[in-house]
Design a protein with these regions (language model features):
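Glycine-rich phosphate-binding loops of nucleotide-dependent enzymes
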Residues: 2-262
């Protein structure tokens, strides 16, 4: 018996006034995939992310996590369902250290239940032990993302690429089932993009599932297992990267007539 999809979205709909931003969008992401979501500017990609991560309430559709109904109506429910995301514009705590940023993510995962208010005030043994575990886990994630040497550096002093990696480390600290990345390669040079690709492949190979929005078509096609293409809020193609690149509607709407060459 086959396992249910990690995330299944059916007929998702979102309307802003008279604008239909998502027009019955459906997709299914299997565990262990890197899944790409692409399309022209204004196609509905970020709106879709905002719906499945609880920032926008959907106006229609059904959502499932591993076959169970999922209502993305609030950010805390999204975290409980096992979805973590990054944003197109970096949203770190700029004046905190890299280590502290990741520890914040870990605190979200543990909900602070190991300490309680009085434990934090009195710095009880349980509080101190919990903090030590969180700190150790955060160090391990920074090492995993290749930025362990910057643990004590202030986040805003890191390079752009390393700030992106720090965002991913913080998201991974919540131990998500699905890691949703909104344009993680934005602003990166070619070397940084190659490093990002290797990092995401490692995360996938270690058992995580990734959903990625990205404008760099070459990166998406070389990285993703499956790709969905949106245009004006509608799905116009879905399949393997090779299938999507050959789809005439995709070529016309997004990739350009030379996309299948070179």
């Amino acid at each position: 018996m086959s396992q249910p999809a990690l995330l299944k979205v059916s007929q998702a709909r979102k309307v802003f006034g008279g604008l239909v931003a998502l027009d019955n969008v459906s997709l299914s992401i299997e565990a262990g995939q890197i899944y790409g979501l692409i399309g022209p500017n204004g196609a509905g990609k970020t709106t879709f992310f905002n719906v499945i991560t609880g920032l926008y309430a959907p106006d229609g559709g059904s959502f499932q996590i591993e076959g169970r109904p999922y209502q993305p109506t609030a950010v805390h429910r999204v975290a409980e369902a096992g979805i973590a995301r990054t944003f197109q514009n970096i949203r770190l705590f700029p004046d905190m250290t890299a280590l502290e940023n990741v520890m914040v993510g870990r605190h979200l995962r543990t909900h602070g239940l190991h300490q309680g208010v009085f434990g934090a005030i009195l710095r009880t043994r349980a509080f101190q032990q919990g903090e030590a575990r969180i700190r150790s886990h955060a160090h391990a994630l920074l090492d995993y993302l290749g930025i362990g040497r910057y643990a004590d550096s202030i986040a805003k002093t890191l390079s752009y690429g390393d700030q992106r990696r720090l965002e991913i480390a913080r998201a991974l600290a919540t131990e998500p089932r699905l890691l949703a990345l909104d344009e993680p390669a934005a602003g990166m040079n070619a070397t940084e993009k190659n490093s990002l690709r290797e990092t995401l492949e490692k995360i996938r190979d270690d058992g995580k599932t990734i959903l990625i929005i990205e404008h760099d078509v070459k990166l998406v096609m070389g990285l993703c297992d499956r790709v969905t293409v949106l245009d004006y809020g509608k799905v116009i193609a879905e399949g393997s990267p090779a299938e999507v690149q050959r789809h005439p509607d995709v070529i016309e709407a997004y990739l350009g007539s030379g996309a299948t060459h070179g």
